[in-house]
Structures are given as structure tokens and as C-alpha cells.
Design a protein with these regions (language model features):
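Active-site-proximal loop/turn and secondary-structure-junction residues that shape catalytic pockets
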Residues: 10, 48-50, 111-115, 146-149, ...
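C-terminal hydrophobic structural anchor segments
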Residues: 165, 173-226
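Long, mid-chain structured domain cores
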Residues: 1-26, 34
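Histidine/acidic residue-rich metal-binding segments in metalloenzymes
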Residues: 24-45, 53-163, 177-195, 213
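Mid-to-C-terminal alpha-helical segments outside catalytic/metal-binding sites
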Residues: 191-193, 208-258
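Short catalytic/ligand-binding loop motif for oxyanion handling, primarily in non-cytosolic enzymes
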Residues: 13-14, 51-55, 115-118, 203-206
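The substrate-binding groove and active-site-proximal loops of carbohydrate-active enzymes
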Residues: 14-23, 80-87, 169-171
Length: 258
């Protein structure tokens, strides 16, 4: 089954172009978010790591309005915009985090490595501490293991109830490093907070490789834990079931799907 995820910055890009005033834009943004779950959306997603960085500040309405004005000037010339203005993006993320909590929807954040336009220094999940502590009712799914900051992300998942660690992209692109990454992640984060995913794209073969390598790495690590006496065989099976499927079923409003 496939379920939609609402991409926050893409929605903002469209509304900045289409709405004539700041207030109309934010009203339309809020209204779209407010009906998301009723329309089948299972999560919001932010790529602030690409656009403005993960050090998301408290909302500043005056600065956000100034950013909107600048972007409208760009839209008038080109017909499109790319929201890379920090004050406005931080302001809209505050609205989104609040709307997500009201609907019991998680919010995904890109963290760590990605395409060449991502500044890795701004993608460290530790930058999200203010958001994590400021929105305790919002479940935050930090994507891609935060690679190469996966130890930091595992620490956040261990100490904050609303932080989840998603393994996508690190599986499969960490390749031979997958077992080492999983060993460190599961040595710190509770397995009930770790989500198997791939972020596979374009070619079906990537999905196959990711599924195979992810299970290979997880099997290696859990076998080691059993042999070391940390887990029983039954506990290792429970951990694998949770990471591969059950945690996602608990987190996302997708029901008990096969």
C-alpha cells in the first residue's frame, strides 16, 4: 500500500506564488494542513536541512513578512520561488508542527547526507533540539539515520520520547557500513524507536538491493547481540519484527496492514 506524505516546503513554494498577501498565504497553508489527515495524508515532511538548515528558530512574524515580500518580488519576475529564506520557513514550520500534533500526524525531517545542494553542517540532527523540546506532542521522524551523525541521532531517540530514527538512504547507500551503523544505532536507541526504510527511487533494483542489504545488516547485528548474551533469540526476533514493520504501524496512521 502507498500513502501520501505532505511536503511542507513544496506546499509553501506554491502558496507563496499563488496567494497575494502574507496573511492569505499563511491562512491557506494552515487550512491545507488542518485537513491533511482527513485527506489520507500520513505524515508531513520538511527539507529544511536543504533550504535553511535544521537550527529552526522561534517564529518571528515581522521577519517572516519581510521574507514573503522578497519572495513575491521574485515570483513576479520568474513565476516561481524556492523558499530558502530562514525566517519564513521557520515561521511556517511552527504552524506545521502545531497542526501535526493536533491531528496526531508525525513530521519527517531530512537529516544528514543527501544531494550536493545540502550543507551537511546544517543537517546535523542535534540542531533540532529546540524543536524536539518545544513540540513534545509532535512525533518527529528524523530521516536517513542522520548519516554520518547516526550516533547523535540514536542518542536523541534514546532520550526524547517524540524522536524516531528512520534508516532510509543509509540503507542501502552506506553499503558495507550498514552493519556497523546498525550496531551503533541499536546499541543506543531502543529498537521500538527505529524504523526500517530505504528511500529507494528511480530504479526497481534499488528497492531490491536495499531490502536485501538492510535485512543482511540487521541479521548480522542481532545475531551478534544474541551470541553476546544481550538478547535472547526470541527478543532478537521481536526487535527485527518491530524495526521492519511494527514500529511504522504504530507511528503512522496506516492501520494494521500486511
Amino acid at each position: 500500500p502507498v500513502h501520501p506524505v505532505l511536503r511542507l516546503e513544496r506546499l509553501a513554494d506554491d502558496l507563496i506564488v499563488s496567494q497575494p498577501t502574507f496573511d492569505q498565504m499563511t491562512d491557506a497553508f494552515t487550512a491545507t494542513l488542518a485537513t491533511a489527515r482527513a485527506r489520507g495524508v500520513v505524515s508531513f515532511k520538511s527539507i529544511a536541512a536543504y533550504r535553511t538548515g535544521l537550527q529552526i528558530d522561534a517564529p518571528d512574524p515581522h521577519a517572516a513578512r519581510q521574507d514573503f515580500r522578497r519572495l513575491k518580488e521574485t515570483a513576479a519576475q520568474t513565476g516561481r520561488v524556492r523558499l530558502a529564506h530562514k525566517a519564513l520557513n521557520d515561521y511556517l514550520l511552527d504552524l506545521a508542527l502545531t497542526a501535526a500534533a493536533r491531528q496526531e500526524l508525525p513530521v519527517q525531517f531530512h537529516t544528514g547526507f543527501g544531494d550536493s545542494d545540502a550543507d551537511l553542517r546544517l543537517a546535523n540532527p542535534l540542531h533540532l533540539r529546540r524543536v524536539i523540546e518545544g513540540y513534545p506532542a509532535t512525533q518527529l521522524v528524523l530521516l536517513h539515520s542522520g548519516w554520518p551523525y547516526y550516533r547523535e541521532l540514536a542518542h536523541l531517540a534514546a532520550i526524547y520520547p517524540n524522536v524516531w530514527l528512520d534508516l532510509s538512504l543509509a540503507i542501502p547507500f552506506a553499503t558495507t557500513g550498514i552493519p556497523a551503523m546498525l550496531r551503533d544505532v541499536l546499541g543506543m536507541a531502543p529498537f521500538s524507536k527505529v524504523l526500517f526504510a530505504t528511500d529507494a527511487f528511480t530504479m526497481p533494483e534499488i528497492y531490491w538491493v536495499a531490502a536485501r542489504w538492510g535485512r543482511w545488516g540487521l541479521t548480522q547485528v542481532l545475531d551478534d547481540f544474541v551470541h553476546a548474551g544481550f538478547f535472547t533469540a526470541a527478543e532478537a526476533h521481536q526487535a527485527a519484527q518491530a524495526i521492519l514493520a511494527d514500529n511504522a504501524r504504530r507511528l503512522y496512521p496506516i492501520g494494521a496492514e500486511p
